[in-house]
Amino acid sequence: MNTPLSDYIQKVCLSVNLEDSQKFRSCITINPGINEGTIRAHFPEPNDFDLHPIPEKFRNVVKSYLKLMKSVYIANSINASFFDLNEMVNNLNRAADTQTNWINQPLINACTELISVYQVRSKNFPEEEEMELSNLENNEYGNSSSSLERLAATINGSFKLSLNDKNLDLSQSKRLDIYFFLGNLIKIYFKLGKLELAKSVEKALKGTRFNLPKLNGAGSSKRYAVTYLYYSALLSLDDADFTTSEEKLVKAMEILSCYKDPKNVKNQTEKILIILLPLKLYNKRLTPSNEIWEKFPKLKFMYKDNLFDAIKNGNLKKFDQALTKYQLILLKNHLYLLFEMMKSLCYLKLVKKTVSIIHSLNSETKSHIVPLSAIQLALEFSTNDSYKESDKFAYNLDAVECILANLISSGKIKGYLSHANRCIVLSKANAFPSLEYK
């Protein structure tokens, strides 16, 4: 007579032998339904004889799974559930090594459940993670790890399993779902603050000699490709590679545009736009349409009404105030360095305004020669809204010269400086080649 345990083992054995993703996934999920979950939790611990029908590499998966079910349904312990599920996913990684990509969906589901259990544990018991991190910092031997690091190691194992699959047929390869593992792994590394590890993962991806799926491929891979592109763009942003960062985010936006209902991806879109909009302004002097501002009023207020407006009008006081006001948001989104560099656009607009005023007052042929003192006064008014002769300038002439030298060297102004005469000599043809806003 068959027992519930033997029936379950037979079901596992059949699903593995038939390479049935859906059935095997249902055999190792922590949520098979409350009744089935309770039944599995009360199975006796299987011995070697019980497990004999199951392919050898999958036996530890079943053993760790049944241990996990007891932690979930009997002990009701979120801590034990996390560690047991982490053990099961590691066993599944080992078992999946020799399988084709039929194993991807069960593995993806197991990893998704592991991440969810970690998130619940972290939300309900934040002191546990804080204590682990504290113990990790105080451990002189450095041989322990936090739950988040354990999670990272496990997902990294799944990523390597996918990346190193040597099957040349992509349709049968575990690489087909690589963006799920890549997107989640790089996100975890960011949470850990280990950006070098995130870079090493990206380097490994670029270094593979095997074909990879298209970023805008079908199915759920799109979602994780967007996650990967977003965090990869942040890495480029931190390296001050603004062009590459923009390209990655544009690709992410192209993928999101394929969704039938934009409302389903509005949050993702806004998260990308908060970085993409200043990149487009800095790289190409592009500003978004009114339609974008209407869809994202928070971005409109922060950018169009404040930071971008200050840049477009050369208003240094408004720019500095907005930079201070939104400092935390900019730091959180890796944008603070970019906006510090965008201050040069503010200077540029101010210099052009000054030159325009001088030209209107002096129509002589030498109006392209601008004294530094004129620009110094413009900087003072833009910074403090006023100037009295008794006041000290916010920018001395050396600082003004330095600002102009940077604008010239970066190609934003055509001309040269005369230190002896304390003036800038502008090109008569096109002194401000990069100031066209579109």
Curated annotation (Swiss-Prot):
This is Protein CSN12 homolog. It comes from Debaryomyces hansenii (strain ATCC 36239 / CBS 767 / BCRC 21394 / JCM 1990 / NBRC 0083 / IGC 2968) (Yeast). Pfam families: PCI. It comes from the Eukaryota. Belongs to the CSN12 family. GO terms for molecular function: double-stranded DNA binding; RNA binding. The gene is CSN12. Residues 226-431 form the PCI domain.
